[in-house]
From Swiss-Prot:
The modification Cysteine sulfenic acid (-SOH) is found at residue 286. HAMAP family: BADH (MF_00804). It comes from Escherichia coli O127:H6 (strain E2348/69 / EPEC). Involved in the biosynthesis of the osmoprotectant glycine betaine. Catalyzes the irreversible oxidation of betaine aldehyde to the corresponding acid. GO terms for molecular function: betaine-aldehyde dehydrogenase (NAD+) activity; metal ion binding. It is an enzyme of class 1 (oxidoreductase). This is Betaine aldehyde dehydrogenase.
């Protein structure tokens, strides 16, 4: 693909130049080619985006629930009509295989938007009787202008996960995509405008997170920030949001999730789940089950089944429909993953496969890392303690149920967890003891629109998707009505 035109900001229904004069480049990680130069939003751009959003939000909130629902449903239709085009752009920007982006990223994002479009008319208050002459009723009102700050691994899906409930509740959103993968969020803004969203209700500000993101979290005109990213960045966003104007926050942060295989499990099923929990999207998924616990007596058989499946991974041309494994999102991220792999070797973990970059004409110019499986791991190893966010699986052994539950919970993270077992009683007994917000039994990774997702501990605050997320983009107003004569004590 030839280099794209310089990308601008999207404010008040159209593209506009950044006042900062600063730019950055986004690359195709499969081959290192520059895709586009992108303008970076500065403080003045954030100010005008907020003013635009405030104007648009008043118009949007004044519409009836059905009017808002129809506009968002039109956006869903456009997303599905343009699925292949958007998936190709997402593949170029992220490096993910087209077989994945065309069937997951836009599809699941559109599903979430459709879900919330349908919920808009059901957003309602309640009536509380006090006595015969008095009652209270409540209204759920929009927060106003909210900000979404996205991560680089699922750019358009995250933009939809954040904007769908916010817009459904009557808010306007200013969205800052990751500077690593900024392109499809701008296309989403076009689609919202085409669907009939009032100008200013969805503005997109590409920029460097440490600057543009901070301007958003500092701004007094923003009522809430929804952030997806790493724990350290999330803590800064939360601190800035509280210090500036006591903003509400949703934090979807990192994970180091356990996948527990029990001795009664079908090992073929367990190996299939472990593969998806570690190598889907080249391991760049926050919910990955990177700590794979297996009974000592099952270790050798499990390892062989995993190795057989790793051999079936198809890396290469990301637009080949048979390819199911792409490069990492950037060269700095590739280098960071390689440092973790080197640390694992240094600390005594044994490499079953991988452990280096992929080599060959198809890979030499891209950010490729081979699918890597470590075994003979211990809980104190760096690769077991810290989030790597790459195609790196760590296999650990255990002897008893109580032991594995204790070790699975021995982490600052609490995003996801899963178990594989044929025993239904054990499945529920163990899952109820795991300290994680998203749990799976005999499966892994699905996050449908109806399912609230979010973490315990350092993995986050609040939830995305589900009914409760729509409510989190509203504030409750309580009104008492008195029909009897008011009695004053004065």
């Amino acid at each position: 693909m030839s280099r794209m035109a310089e990308q601008q900001l999207y404010i008040h229904g159209g593209y506009t130049s950044a006042t900062s004069g600063r730019t950055f480049e986004t690359i195709n990680p499969a081959n290192g080619n520059v895709l586009a130069t992108v303008q970076a939003a500065g403080r003045e751009d954030v100010d005008r985006a907020v003013k635009s959003a405030q104007q648009g939000q008043k118009i949007w909130a004044a519409m009836t629930a059905m009017e808002r629902s129809r506009i968002l449903r039109r956006a869903v239709d456009i997303l599905r009509e343009r699925n292949d085009e958007l998936a190709k752009l997402e593949t170029l920007d992220t490096g993910k295989a087209y077989s994945e982006t065309s069937t997951v990223d836009i599809v699941t994002g559109a599903d979430v938007l459709e879900y919330y479009a349908g919920l808009i008319p059901a957003l309602e208050g309640c009536q509380i009787p006090l006595r015969e002459t008095s009652f209270v009723y409540t209204r759920r009102e929009p927060l106003g202008v909210v900000a979404g700050i996205g991560a680089w691994n699922y750019p358009i899906q995250i933009a939809l996960w954040k904007s769908a409930p916010a817009l459904a509740a009557g808010n306007a959103m200013i969205f800052k995509p990751s500077e690593v993968t900024p392109l499809t969020a701008l296309k989403l803004a076009e689609i919202y405008s085409e669907a009939g969203l009032p100008d200013g209700v969805f503005n997109v500000l590409p920029g460097v997170g440490a600057e543009t993101g901070q301007y958003l979290t500092d701004h007094p005109g923003i009522a809430k920030v929804s952030f997806t990213g790493g724990v350290a960045s999330g803590k800064k966003v939360m601190a800035n949001s509280a210090a500036s104007s006591l903003k509400e926050v949703t934090m979807e942060l990192g994970g180091k999730s356990p996948l527990i295989v029990f001795d009664d499990a079908d090992l073929d099923l367990a190996a299939d789940i472990a593969m998806m929990a570690n190598f889907f999207s080249s391991g760049q998924v926050c919910t990955n089950g990177t700590r794979v616990f297996v009974p000592t007596k099952c270790k050798a058989a499990f390892e062989q089944k995993v190795l057989a499946r790793v051999e079936r991974i198809r890396a290469g041309d990301v637009f080949d429909p048979q390819t199911n494994f792409g490069p990492l999102v950037s060269f700095p991220h590739r280098d960071n993953v390689l440092r973790y792999i080197a640390k694992g070797i240094e600390e005594g973990a044994r490499v079953l496969c991988g452990g280096d970059v992929l080599k060959g004409d198809s890979f030499d110019n891209g950010a490729w890392v081979a699918p890597t499986v470590f075994t003979d791991c211990s809980d104190d190893m760096t690769i077991v303690r810290e989030e790597i966010f790459g195609p790196v699986m760590s296999i650990l052994t255990y002897e008893s149920e109580d032991e594995v539950i204790r070790r699975a919970n021995d982490t600052d993270y609490g995003l996801a967890a899963g178990i594989v077992t044929a025993d239904l009683n054990r499945a529920h007994r163990v899952i109820h003891q795991l300290e994680a917000g998203i749990c799976w039994i005999n499966t892994w990774g699905e996050s449908p629109a109806e399912m609230p997702v979010g973490g315990y501990k350092h993995s986050g605050i609040g939830r995305e998707n589900g009914v409760m997320t729509l409510q989190s983009y509203t504030q409750v107003k309580s009104i008492q009505v008195e029909m009897a004569k008011f009695q004053s004590i004065f």
